[in-house]
Amino acid sequence: MESNLSSFNKIEQQINGSRKISNYLIGGMLTIGGIGFILASISSYTGRDLLPLGNPSSLLFIPQGIIMGAYGVIANLLNIYLWYLVFINFGSGYNSFDKVSQSVEIKRKGLFKDIEVKLNFDEIKSVKLDISEGFNPRRRIALVLKGRKKALPLSGAGELKPLLQVEEEGARLAKFLNVNLEGLK
């Protein structure tokens, strides 16, 4: 969550989506691996080496060639899905807090349509810091709304910022919205 514009009356935060280096690396590996498995399957069927490495034409088509072809098809289906998410920049968007109009606007890029939430300041109960350490750490800022049990997350998925930065952003936002800050121990 990056603050692009912060003034006395307005805070805007850009949220990064699925265009991350890790997704590009995984997509590249899936592409190469999926095509490699399909070429190995075709090589075992035709008896001609289509890959520069190894000798896949010596594999029996049943069962090794068929299994490698299935792995290749599954890898390429996952690959198409992942590249689609990267292409549309799934999860990207912004958070906008405006003191003049007393409104909050949260917008994210969804799978098939954009997700947009508009709130008034009086609907916000508090700002919550959701911090958990361990094998799968989570550090996110969320809005606790009046009349709802679940908090509305403001941080992007997979963002892992330093603890001090998350605490400072949460405190600044709570002060701006004039609400309590929850989750500090």
Swiss-Prot record:
Which superkingdom heads the taxonomic lineage of this protein's source?
Bacteria
Kindly give the membrane topology term recorded for this protein: Multi-pass membrane protein
Transmembrane annotation, as ranges? 24-44, 66-86
Is Glycoprotein among the key words of this record?
no
Check the record and name the InterPro entries matching this protein.
PSI_Ycf4_assembly
> Where found, per UniProt?
Cellular thylakoid membrane
Which residues fall in a coiled-coil region? none
Q: Extract one GO cellular component term from the record.
A: photosystem I
Cite the entry's keywords alphabetically: Membrane, Photosynthesis, Thylakoid, Transmembrane, Transmembrane helix
Q: Which GO terms describe its biological process?
A: photosynthesis
Q: Which family does it belong to?
A: Belongs to the Ycf4 family.
Protein function: Seems to be required for the assembly of the photosystem I complex.
UniProt protein name = Photosystem I assembly protein Ycf4
Q: What is the lineage of its organism?
A: Bacteria, Bacillati, Cyanobacteriota, Cyanophyceae, Synechococcales
